[in-house]
Amino acid sequence: MKKTLAALIVGAFAASAANAAVVYNNEGTNVELGGRLSVIAEQSNSTRKDQKQQHGELRNAGSHFHIKATHNFGDGFYAQGYLETRLVSDYQSSSDNFGNIITKYAYVTLGNKGFGEVKLGRAKTIADGITSAEDKEYGVLENKEYIPKDGNSVGYTFKGIDGLVLGANYLLAQKREAYKTDAATPGEVIAQAISNGVQVGAKYDANNIIAGIAYGRTNYREDLAELGNKSGKKQQVNGALSTLGYRFSDLGLLVSLDSGYAKTKNYKDKHEKRYFVSPGFQYELMEDTNVYGNFKYERNSVDQGKKAREHAVLFGVDHKLHKQVLTYIEGAYARTRTNDKDKTEKTEKEKSVGVGLRVYF
């Protein structure tokens, strides 16, 4: 009998958590170590910003390590500490993308199984898991342009009802000036970085139905100290993300529709609007082998100004060689057409295809 797609998703894409090694378990305290090493061989013209030509590379693709400590107090109460690091290069010229160890997530949690949990620190927000589209490396959905999916935050999550997750987050500034210059004061939020924000969201995944929605209002520092023209600086983004899907359990098939809308308020300039729709699917081709893909149409426009339309498609196949070893082939193609007043239409294309291997531990 085919596995349900929920089991496939958990088994294939969250294996690092499921297979984490318990290194200490005594008197209500549990400590786990886990992570993955991930490498991809690819041909792409969009690995780096402003890249023009397509190149072949063998590089790091999200390798990370995490440690989680949980202390149970009794009566359903618990405290948890979580730290996750990434291997990231500081230099664009480092083609393998293996570099310094940085902190990706670091937070503490206080919670109760019946009342929910409060999370403090650099963590994922409720917006992170809203959309349903699957990808390993070349995701065509730019959710963070609508609502930030992680950051320095205070968050509350409730999971007391089977299949339902409710959440709210307050984001704080994470990037601040370290040195004094003519245009910067130490301790102030870096220009065009997040100043603060709020998010609320809900997601339901049960009885073969998937439904989710999140709303966020994010404020940015405008960079008013910059000399010259100060207009056009991002001040605030109001965004929403949603998903609706149905799981055909007997067929091993999930079909979904993701969408988003955002309005950006700019300093002394016209506002910008963007939206996208993205139908997608995930299908169990055979045991331990899955096929997935999605299409996206996105439009970005300024009142009586520049307009951009993007069509993008992603397709991939993954196969579990072992419960802790996943290999995949994934490709994506995107075409963006930009129109501006009295200017010739500009067309940009992004093409990527890669073969990846993940080893979890």
Swiss-Prot record:
PANTHER family assigned to the protein according to its UniProt record, in alphabetical order: OUTER MEMBRANE PORIN F-RELATED, PROTEIN YDDL-RELATED
Quaternary data: Homotrimer.
An example Gene Ontology biological process: monoatomic ion transport
Family in the record: Belongs to the Gram-negative porin family.
Chain's gene name: ompP2
GO MF annotation list: porin activity
A GO term from the CC aspect: cell outer membrane
Main location per the UniProt record: membrane
Gene3D superfamilies: Porin
Location(s) in or outside the cell: Cell outer membrane
UniProt-listed InterPro entries: Gram-neg_bact_OMP, Gram_neg_porin_domain, Porin_dom_sf
Name the record gives this protein: Outer membrane protein P2
Function recorded in the entry: Forms pores that allow passive diffusion of small molecules across the outer membrane.
TM region(s), chain numbering: none
Pfam families listed in its UniProt record: Porin_4
Keyword Nucleotide-binding in record: no
Keyword Transmembrane on entry: yes
Topology in membrane: Multi-pass membrane protein
Signal peptide positions on this chain: 1-20
Keywords: Cell outer membrane, Ion transport, Membrane, Porin, Signal, Transmembrane, Transmembrane beta strand, Transport
